[in-house]
Amino acid sequence: MNGTPLWYRFIPFLGRLSELTKRQWKLLRTLTVVLLLTGCASGSGQAENELPSTTPITQPTDGEWPVSTHYDGKRFYNTSGADKGAGDISKFFWQNLWNKEKWPKGIANPPADPIVDRVTEGIRATYINHATVLVQVAGLNILTDPVWSKRVSPVTFAGPKRVRDPGIPIEALPEIDLILVSHNHYDHLDTTSLKKLRQQQEKEPVIVSGLGNAELLRKQGYLNAVELDWGESTQVGMATVHFVECQHRSGRGAFDQMKTLWGSFVVETPEGAIYFAGDTGYSPHFKVQGEQYGPFALSLLPIGAYKPRWFMKDIHLNPEEAVQAHLDLNSQQSLGIHFGVFQLTWEAIDSPIADLEAALDARGLPTETFWVLEPGESERRLSYQWQSTSRLVE
C-alpha cells in the first residue's frame, strides 16, 4: 500500500471499536468465542431392534470417495463455484454488530395441533421449528433436521439462541422411522437433540445424510447411519430417499470446512414426491430436479436467514428465490421453513413472511400454494385438496 504502515490500516477499525455500546461489546466477545471454536463455520452399543426395511440402492465406500465434479479428494465444492472465503465470513460477523435488526427475546406459541401416530392416506406436515418438520406419509414418520436445543452453537453459553420454543416437545413425538439430516451446521445437525431422540425411540430410526456425516451420527447412537453422495438413494419402507445437489457449505469447526457433503432430499412415496431443501442458495439445480423428480406434492423450502445478500445469496434463498424454486420444482404446495426461531442474519423476525407474501403477489400466486405454519401446526393433503388447521402468520 505504497509504504503505508500496517498499523495505520487498523485506525478505522479501532475507531469503530470506540463506538461500541455495552451490548455490542458483549456480542463481540460472544462472536469471538464462537468464531474461534468454529472457524467461522456458522451457517456453519447394539441396536435393540431391527431397522425398518432399508436397502441402499447405491452404497458408497465409507470415508473413501472418488474424485468428482464436487469432490477433489480432500474437500467438497459447489458445482456452481459459489463460495465465500474466510475474509468474507469475518466481514459478515463484524458487520453483524451494527446491522442486525432487533428481535424479541421470546414469542409464545399458540396451542399445537394434536399429533397422530400414523398417516396412511395423503401427506401430513407438522412444522416444529426452524428446519424441523414432522412429515407423515404412507405409514412412515419422517423428521427433518431435528433441533430442540436452546442454542445452535458449539457451546451452551454463546451463539444464536432461540426466541420460540419447538412447537412439539421432543418427548411428545410419535415413533420416528426416518430422519433426514441435510448437512452438519449446528442449526441443522444438533447432536444433543439427536442423542435424546435416539434414547427415547424403541427402534433405531433410519438416519440419512451426506458423505462424511455418518461417523458423527453413529456417536449419537445411530449405528446404522446411511451416508449418500449426490444422486444416490436408499429405500425405507414404501419410500425411496434420494440425496440431491444443493448450493451450500459445511463445517463445525476450524479444521473440517467443506469436509462433509451437504444436500437436499427427494422422498418418493405412493402419495407423491416430497422435497426437503435443507439450506441452499438458488441455482439451476432446482429446475433440473423438478424435471427429474417432479411434480412434487409438497416442498419444504427455506425462506429466512437471507440478509445481507452480498454474503447470503450463494448459500441461502430469500423469499423471492424460494418462490422461484417452488415454480422450478413444479411443486403443487410448498411450506416455508428456516425462519423466525434463531436470529442468524440481519433481517427482522417478520421480514420472511412479509417478503414471501410480496413475492407470491408479484407472481400472481395465491398464498394457499406456498404457506407458513406456526410451530406445532399441521397441514394434511388429501388427493389434490388441502384440509388446513393453519393460518398464514400475521
Description of each model-found segment:
Residues T192-L197, Q220-G221, H285-Q289:
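A short acidic, amphipathic alpha-helical/loop segment
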Residues V67, F157-V208, N224, G294-L300:
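Active-site metal-binding motif and surrounding structural segment of the metallo-beta-lactamase
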Residues T132-Q136, Q235-F296, K313, L317-E321:
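Catalytic core of the metallo-beta-lactamase
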Residues W148-D165, R249-D256, K307-H316, Q343:
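Acidic/histidine-rich helix-loop elements
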